[in-house]
A protein has these predicted regions:
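Acidic/His- and Gly-rich active-site-bordering loop/insert found
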Residues: 2-124, 143-150, 327
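Generic secondary-structure signature for well-ordered alpha-helical cores
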Residues: 28, 55, 143-146, 175-176, ...
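An extended, acidic, His-containing surface patch that forms the Zn2+-binding/catalytic region
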Residues: 59, 82-84, 192-193, 248-314, ...
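Alpha-helical metal-binding/catalytic segments enriched in His/Glu/Asp
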Residues: 89, 113-163, 208-212, 224-246, ...
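Acidic, glycine-rich active-site loops and adjacent beta-strand->loop/helix elements
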Residues: 93-95, 118, 155-164, 186-190, ...
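Acidic/histidine-rich catalytic neighborhood of metal-dependent amide-processing enzymes
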Residues: 123-201, 459-462
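Flexible glycine/proline-rich, aromatic-decorated loop/lid segments
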Residues: 197-213, 417-422
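A short glycine-threonine-serine/GTX helix/turn-capping micro-motif
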Residues: 219-228, 313-316
Length: 462
């Protein structure tokens, strides 16, 4: 009974095909939460797949529902000693739409396909592959020790890809059931494929629409050009006053007052790397005076996700009556999400664009969160991962993307430590989503070591 035995068990689970078999079965389940017809599949992932898996590990399981949720929730718990440390785990079994016609020839979103150093399939990276690693690591520790040495609770939701509707309410209504000492979970990418990573929160995400509706229909550009406004041109200028030509945000309330010293220290040795097939980082893009890692992990960013005016598929010589854009602000701690649209309204009005209508494009907002990089649980996890790999992991104060971490940190009051098992070029929301088996195997080793250390040492002292 040793740490090395637990890690060897995790390696064997991978090497003998257990992990691949489990993930293949889970990828084949078409759990598209953005598809209203997939309700039965969302439920079956929990009742037919997760419940039997966790019950074999000694967990008691219950299914929870909420009227706002796209699918059910599973809460599983294994209580070994009420006085022991309790670790809260999280994952989501839903995926985005499969986008079947867009996948490369020979691939399918609903089949795990091995091709070279990649395993393809929807959910391999986000998030079936990741929570499968953590559950496999729990099993490896149980096999080695006969117990975990701590209490474990695991929440799996089926609506994360639609903004986790109902998750906040379920957590608020079940605080006693969900009570724990720390959240340890996995989602998102590492800093790079080669470097194990911890992140301690996430940027917030707010999606909204800009629209100009000038008149009922289009008018001939020869007869009316120079006489009536062009909404497409006006909206382009409105967007240009929101962010400069290199992406620098011009709405003061959308950026933090400062980059905290502890965040800057944590990011000092973090080099952003998208891998050989990722896009080239453009050094002049974004907030001036910040490093690439500070721009994506320490600052806000504004994006235009879609833009429409006229008839792009069949342009005609007419001044369009309308223009529309779907935009997004990724924001960090220090930006008030309730002030995002009011601040933009004031900004556009000051710059002469009162005709631009604003509307949030989805009800749910992912709020920004960030655990102090020098928190005792962070130091504990860093030491554990370093012990397993003999190398210091990257520590990101928050993920560049967004996830419902604020529910765990603010509603449940948990310190949050995430250990991602994907990498930046995994195509997680695109065709050809994949996981790197080398990272999956290392992830099993890392998590088995981390769970072993928690069972051996308990919660770190403040």
């Amino acid at each position: 009974m040793s740490r090395e035995t637990a890690i060897a068990n995790a390696e064997r689970y991978f090497d003998e095909g257990g992990y691949k078999a489990d993930l293949s079965r889970r990828v084949a389940m078409k759990t598209e939460s953005q598809n209203p017809d997939r309700g039965p599949e969302l439920a079956e992932y929990l009742t037919g797949e997760m419940v039997p898996t966790l019950e074999k590990l000694g967990f008691t399981c219950r299914i929870l529902h909420h009227p706002r949720a796209k699918g059910p929730f599973l809460i599983a718990e294994r209580i070994e000693d009420p006085k022991a440390t309790t670790v809260f785990g999280y994952g989501h079994g839903d995926v985005i739409r499969g986008l079947e016609p867009q996948w490369r020839e020979g691939l399918s979103p609903w089949a795990l396909v091995e091709d070279g150093e990649r395993w393809y399939g929807r959910g391999t990276a986000d998030n079936k592959g990741q929570h499968s690693i953590n559950i496999g690591a729990l099993a490896a520790v149980l096999k080695a020790r006969g117990k975990l040495g701590f209490n474990a609770k695991y929440l799996i939701e089926m609506g994360e890809e639609t903004g986790s509707p109902g998750l906040r309410e379920v957590c608020e209504a079940n605080k006693a059931l969900f009570k724990a000492d720390v959240l340890i979970a996995s989602d998102g990418p590492r800093l790079s494929a080669e470097r194990p990573t911890l992140f301690l929160g996430s940027r917030g995400a707010f999606n909204f629409d800009l629209e100009i509706d000038a008149r009922p229909g289009g008018h001939h550009s020869g007869n009316w050009g120079g006489l009536i406004s062009n909404p497409g041109l006006q909206l382009a200028h409105a967007i240009a006053c929101i962010a400069g030509p290199t992406g620098q945000i011009r709405v003061p309330e959308w950026v933090p007052a400062e980059l905290p010293a502890s965040v800057r220290r944590a990011l000092a040795d973090c080099e952003v790397d998208g891998g050989s097939d990722g896009p080239q980082i453009e050094p002049e893009w974004g907030e001036p005076g910040l490093t690439p890692s500070e721009r994506v992990f320490g600052w806000s960013s504004f994006e235009v996700l879609a833009y429409r005016t006229g008839n792009p598929d069949n342009p005609v010589n007419a001044i369009p009556p309308k223009a529309w854009a779907r935009c997004q602000l990724r924001f960090v701690v220090g930006v008030d999400p309730a002030n995002i649209l009011p601040a933009l309204r004031r900004h556009l009005d000051r710059h002469g664009f009162p005709m631009v209508k604003l509307a949030a494009s989805r009800e749910e907002i992912f709020h920004a969160t960030r655990l102090d990089p020098e928190h005792p649980w962070v130091n504990f996890a860093v030491d554990s991962l370093k012990r397993t790999t003999n190398a210091k992991p990257a520590v990101l104060p928050n993920l560049g993307g967004s996830l419902p971490n604020d529910i765990f940190s603010d509603v449940l009051g948990l310190p949050t430590v995430w250990v991602p098992h994907s990498y930046p070029s995994c195509s997680q929301h695109a065709p050809n989503e994949h996981i790197l088996p080398a990272i999956a195997r290392e992830g099993l080793r890392l998590m088995a070591g981390l769970y072993w250390d928690i069972g051996e040492k308990g919660a770190p002292r403040s």
